[in-house]
Amino acid sequence: MDVQICRGVKVKKYRGIIPGDKEKNQMTSKHYKYFQPNDKDKKDDQSDCVIRALCKVMNKSWLEVFDELLPFARELQCMPNSKPCYETFLLNHGFVYQEISNKKGIKLPTVDSFTKDHKDGVYVLRLAHHIIASVDCYYYDTWDSGDCCVYGYWKK
């Protein structure tokens, strides 16, 4: 079990089946699909959400995306999974960013509701401390982040 920030609150992030909790085990969204392109990360604990999301939207392997991020990271002198690096990468690959207003009184969409409303297309969703891919009515991650708020997205 890990802790994840969701809607500004720390929540417990369970991996796989929750022992003794049949209700939670059956609560996975129908729009969620498990996605782990990193063959070396058997426990889903590498904190490589940026690379995983880019693998899905670019239809490339984990190593291909990692290698393509390195020149941007070197140029910007930052880590490959840092915001300046992946933003530059996405812009260079034709993605356009759309901020979602989080003004007082405006409810942010959840990953699940965003995916339902954006049935067609390729998106990279920005959550609190997390990035995921949304492609043609499904969101892809190593855990079901459907209840987390979307703060912005890149669309191809």
Regions found by a protein language model. Name each.
Residues 73-129, 135-144:
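Conserved active-site-adjacent core of cysteine acyl-enzyme catalytic domains
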